[in-house]
């Protein structure tokens, strides 16, 4: 009899006002018993207590909470996840961009993004083909995406390779350095940065990266 390996869904980052974890927790609750999944939630923030409360309410036994890790351990942590969760609440487009998407791409892992359909992270996931974009509250689609990724090793591998390729093409060191040089040259040529008004937004969301 073939042993089905345990697959880890990783969420690493802030449990903040702009992040949405309810959908994925309800999706995990709905999974069939043959889906061998553990969920690792790493980080802290204002939403952590509510997340713990919901886990307890749903009686989820395959959830593990861990405190934030120091920066030098971050790459190892990201590599430990087989699937990565990135989340963003509805109506936060233009206010926050969950930076964890870039770390996920850099370690070549498939992504489940739960958030607005039209935002930077959704565009990255679609353009790269590295995962699924799911609207907040769509528990059925989230559960289906989890099942597919847990049960299909080839799909995880393919989406992970796409993530790594997209990261190298769009956000690799050479590309990033070239962008920085381009910005510096533009500023030097113009003598100043374009002045743009900064919108006033909720402080909690402003700190939510």
Residue ranges of model-derived segments:
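Conserved acidic donor-binding segment of nucleotide-sugar-dependent glycosyltransferases
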Residues: 116, 127, 132-139, 148-154
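Nucleotide-sugar-dependent
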Residues: 19, 68-79, 84-105, 110-123
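Conserved donor-binding/catalytic core segment of Leloir-type glycosyltransferases
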Residues: 2-19, 25-28, 40
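C-terminal alpha-helical cap of glycosyltransferases
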Residues: 173-209
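Nucleotide-activated donor-binding/catalytic signature segment of Leloir-type glycosyltransferases, i.e.
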Residues: 6, 36, 40-43, 48-75
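Conserved donor-binding loops in enzymes that form glycosidic bonds
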Residues: 11-16, 44, 67-68, 170
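Amphipathic alpha-helical segment in the mid-to-C-terminal domain
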Residues: 71, 139, 156, 169-177
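A short, well-ordered alpha-helix in the C-terminal region of glycosyltransferases
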Residues: 141-144, 148, 155-169
